[in-house]
Curated annotation (Swiss-Prot):
TM spans (from-to): none
Record gene name: cheD
This protein's name: Probable chemoreceptor glutamine deamidase CheD
Keywords: Chemotaxis, Hydrolase
One example of a Gene Ontology biological process annotation: chemotaxis
Amino acid sequence: MMGQAHAEDSGPAIKVHVTQGESHVSADPQVVMTTVLGSCIAACLRDPTTGIGGMNHFLLPDSGDRKDGGDAVRYGAYAMELLINGLLKKGARRDRLEAKIFGGGKLFDGLSDVGASNAAFAERFLRDEGIPIVSSSTGGLSARRVEFWPASGRVRQRLVAVDNAPAEVRRPTPAVAPTANSGDLELF
């Protein structure tokens, strides 16, 4: 039996890596946006009618009472507004936007659960903005590698053992190593 073909399978992919504090928007069916997440959140937003979509990657929900010192891009509110405005500039309509959110893991034992705060912020922000979350994968103890094809809305998530994660999402090794969870999750 032949598998389902995807538009992005018809040629070489153009990979765009979205790092902490960044946001990217595209309608090109060959573009795949990628990121690796620990406690950070990536929001994948798109207008399914136009095929315009984008991804952001933020570290913290907000700056709290601290001065952000020019680091506003690290915070969720700014990152979400930047992504939404980028989509609208490309021709997406706000009333058609839908979201998929990923990340928010708890990778450091004994510390506050920044990942849960990040996930709660993203859910609250999107609800307040009237943007439906059509799928999500947040929380847990694993890092995630996320690939998003903005034109089709397809997302692939791979859980990453913390020992194999990039340095920015790695946590100290516990005395007893957790069992590896190597699940793939693909959302359409």
